[in-house]
Each structure stands twice: as C-alpha cells, then as structure tokens.
C-alpha cells in the first residue's frame, strides 16, 4: 500500500502543477531540477531493486547452507550404524539424498536471481559435482573409502556455501547499503532544490494574479523559501522513513515470492527412528543423551581480506551511466528547443520592430507631404 499511496500523491502533485502552470514548466530551472530528480530517483530505485534481488538470493543460499549442514551430519552418522541394519542405513541415505537435492536446487535458483553475477563460491561446476555425488549416494555408503570421498564433496560444498553467505553479507552491507544510503541522501537534496524552485514559482504566480499581499497571506512569503536546518533534518528523516517503508514492502513481496525448495520427507515409524538413534549410540559407545547433544558441523569463517571482491557497480545495478547519458540527451534537446523558441520570439520582436519603423516612416512621409501641400497652398 505504501508504494501505491506514494504514486497517488505524485500523480496529484503533477495535476496541481499542471493546473497552476497551464501544463507547462514554470521555468527552465524547474525542468532541469525535475530531470535531475528523476535521474536520481531512478538510480535509487535500481539500487533498491538490486538489494531485493540479492536478499532473495541470499535467502536461498542460507537455506541451502542449512540443508548441507544437516546432510553432512547425517552422512557422518550413517557410518556408525552397523552394516546389518541395512534398512536404517538406506533410510538415512535417502534422507541425506533429499537434503542434498534441495540444497543443490536452492543454490541454482539463487544464481537465477543474479544473472550476470559469477558466484566466487558454489559455482555452477561445483553444484554439478555435488549433484553427481548425490546420484551415487547409495553406492558410496557401501565402503568406508567411498563414504569418505562423498563426505569430502559434501563437506567442501557446505564450507563454501558458508563462504558464499559471508560474501553476500559483505556485498549487501558494505556495498549495496552504502550506495543506497548515498542515493537516498542525493535524492533528498534534489527533492529539496525542486521544492524550493516550485515554491518560488508558485509565489510569483500568486503575486502576478493577486498581488504581493495576497501571496504573503497565503503563507508563501520570502521566509518560506528558506528551509531551516531542523526542517531539513525532519524532511530527510521523513523521506528516509518513507523510502524505507516502500523498500520493505517491495522486499517483503520479493521474499514472499521466493520459492524455497524443502527436502522430501522420508517416511519412518517412531520405532524405526528410535532404533536408528539407539544403533548409532551403541556404535559410538555413548549414551543417547550424549548423542542428542551433538552439535552442527563447525566451519571456519573466511578472513575478510581473503574473501572474494564484490562485483562491479555495473554488475550490481546495471548500466546506470546509460540513465545519466539519457538525462544529458534530454537536457540538450530541451536546451535546443528553448533556443529555437527564443530565436522565434526574437525574430518576432524584430519583425514587429521593423513593422513599427515602417509605419513610423510612412507616417512621417505622409506628414511631410501634408506640410508641403499646406505650404504650397499658403503660397498660392
């Protein structure tokens, strides 16, 4: 609703301005400031949209990371179950397989949100390797050697998915959020400049129509053109809050549409589940309570200086320079149109001046002729 309400207010503002200035711009300065405002606004919207895509992709990576962690836990767990309990081992292998399929799919889908971005971790070929290992899972649980080989693939992907999450956080927090804040501040500055110019133009219009006293009575005297610092801060906070609400609403919609793949459940009776737990505890020589306290797999964070660099601005936000170039083209076309209009006005003035001189010359010639005739009549 926030975005719709904002668009409604902008539409009402445009209608009011069109009524006041007869569907024209009040000044060349207003046009220039409005184009600068539109460019800055589009830039801010692009960055906001990029943040929404990155957060949606991060959500998928986060789920994939959790699913990989659980799969590593259960795959490690399976080797502690006696070989005679084949039904239990196959049940856990199926569970691991389902979690790995879900993780692979979520990793691939996350890349779909960020087309043109090369992931430094969990690349496409790494996901393909994980999928091949997943397909061989029932054979890999047959021997210790093959089990360990599969574990190396699963654990490596799990660790690299953690590095990928780190990379996402750095890109979002250190790059996108920084650029978004700068864009919001720049947008506020342009909004303020445009507002001051429009207030000035409206005041001039009121003075033209009703006189200075009526304009002052309307609350648009010179003092209104000077916005104090407290007012600036209030407007800045209001704008930031307004944009934040719109961004949160867009992000919420985006995240609601993210299709997170969950692993297919493996149907097991309570007796089978209890038997699996008891068998694993017996293989370890530990109590059931000690096994229940088993923690998730540990993973070392990548030092920031070793983390992959963030993408370029063009990769993150698209070709923003093209928006700027379009703005410059629009300004050049507007300036040419204004020059043509001024030339036409000047030409019209010159033609009127020439016509006036011509009329004056004819009038003087007629007057001289009349005086000459009068003189001749007087002589006669």
Placement of each model-derived feature along the sequence:
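Extended, amphipathic alpha-helical coiled-coil scaffold segments used for oligomerization/tethering
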Residues: 1-48, 66-88
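C-terminal modules of long, charged coiled-coil scaffolds in eukaryotic assembly complexes
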Residues: 57, 64, 69-79, 83-380
């Amino acid at each position: 609703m926030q975005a719709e309400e904002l668009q409604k207010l902008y539409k009402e503002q445009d209608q009011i301005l069109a009524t006041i200035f007869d569907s024209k711009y009040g000044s060349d300065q207003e046009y220039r400031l409005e184009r600068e405002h539109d460019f800055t606004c589009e830039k801010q919207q692009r960055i906001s949209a990029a943040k929404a895509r990155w957060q949606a992709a991060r959500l998928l990576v986060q789920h994939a990371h959790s699913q990989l962690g659980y799969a590593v836990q259960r795959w490690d767990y399976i080797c502690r179950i006696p070989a005679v309990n084949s039904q239990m081992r196959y049940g856990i292998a199926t569970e691991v397989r389902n979690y790995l399929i879900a993780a692979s799919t979520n990793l691939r889908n996350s890349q779909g949100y960020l087309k043109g971005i090369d992931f430094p971790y969990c690349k496409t070929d790494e996901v393909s390797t994980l999928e091949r290992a997943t397909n061989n899972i029932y054979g890999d649980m047959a021997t210790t050697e093959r089990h360990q080989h599969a574990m190396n693939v699963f654990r490596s992907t799990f660790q690299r998915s953690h590095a990928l999450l780190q990379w996402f956080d750095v890109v979002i927090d250190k790059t996108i959020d920084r650029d978004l804040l700068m864009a919001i501040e720049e947008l506020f500055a342009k909004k303020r400049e445009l507002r001051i110019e429009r207030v000035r133009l409206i005041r001039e219009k009121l003075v033209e129509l009703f006189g200075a006293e009526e304009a002052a009575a309307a609350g648009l005297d010179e003092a209104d053109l000077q916005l104090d610092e407290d007012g600036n801060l209030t407007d800045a906070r209001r704008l930031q809050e307004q944009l934040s609400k719109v961004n949160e609403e867009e992000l919420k919609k985006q995240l609601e549409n993210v299709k997170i793949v969950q692993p297919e459940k493996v149907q097991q009776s309570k007796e089978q589940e209890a038997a699996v737990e008891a068998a694993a505890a017996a293989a370890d020589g530990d109590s059931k309570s000690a096994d229940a306290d088993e923690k998730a797999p540990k993973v070392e964070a990548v030092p920031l200086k070793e983390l992959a660099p963030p993408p370029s601005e063009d990769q993150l936000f698209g070709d923003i320079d093209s928006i700027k170039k379009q703005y410059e083209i629009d300004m050049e076309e507007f300036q040419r149109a204004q020059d043509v209009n001024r030339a036409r006005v000047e030409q019209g003035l010159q033609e009127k001046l020439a016509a006036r001189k011509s009329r004056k010359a004819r009038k003087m010639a007629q007057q001289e002729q009349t005086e000459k005739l009068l003189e001749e009549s007087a002589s006669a």
